[in-house]
Amino acid sequence: MPKQVVEVLVEGGKATPGPPLGPAIGPLGLNVKQVVDKINEATKDFAGMQVPVKIIVDPVTKQFEIEVGVPPTSQLIKKELGLEKGSGEPKHNIVGNLTMEQVIKIAKMKKDQMLALTLKAAAKEVIGTALSMGVTVEGKDPREVQKEIDEGVYDELFEKAEKE
């Protein structure tokens, strides 16, 4: 019998046997507490963030494994800036400012899950998310910073980051 995959979004380090986890894995005959403990251990570094988790279950042996994804870009931006939430009106209400170093740090975390082929392209995706959240980059409108990336203004930072 093929393995079954259950995908859930849980708060890092704070998964509980209640929804969405319990109802999703209970019918598979797993020890829910064991699964919850393993997820909490695997996601403790992402405390306070929503984290995508895959639970891969062998329905015959009841063995399972946990795969932890990287939180959504918006969650990483909020954590980096210590924000509760993004702006309800991103064009009128700015809630924070990212440095280019912070943008690159987030882009490196997310790059494997993005369609971007280069770190520059990944950084531009992060900046796009910042724009939709009401977050400026280097104190400027995120669209302006995306143009500056295309013009090579931050090339030194990208070269340094790619060597790390």
Curated annotation (Swiss-Prot):
It comes from the Archaea. Pfam families: Ribosomal_L11, Ribosomal_L11_N. Keywords: Ribonucleoprotein, Ribosomal protein, RNA-binding, rRNA-binding. Transmembrane segments: none annotated. GO terms for biological process: translation. InterPro entries: Ribosomal_uL11, Ribosomal_uL11_C, Ribosomal_uL11_C_sf, Ribosomal_uL11_CS, Ribosomal_uL11_N, Ribosomal_uL11_N_sf. One of its GO terms (cellular component) is large ribosomal subunit. The keyword Amino-acid biosynthesis does not apply. GO terms for molecular function: large ribosomal subunit rRNA binding; structural constituent of ribosome. Belongs to the universal ribosomal protein uL11 family. Forms part of the ribosomal stalk which helps the ribosome interact with GTP-bound translation factors. HAMAP family: Ribosomal_uL11. This is Large ribosomal subunit protein uL11. It comes from Pyrococcus furiosus (strain ATCC 43587 / DSM 3638 / JCM 8422 / Vc1). The gene is rpl11.
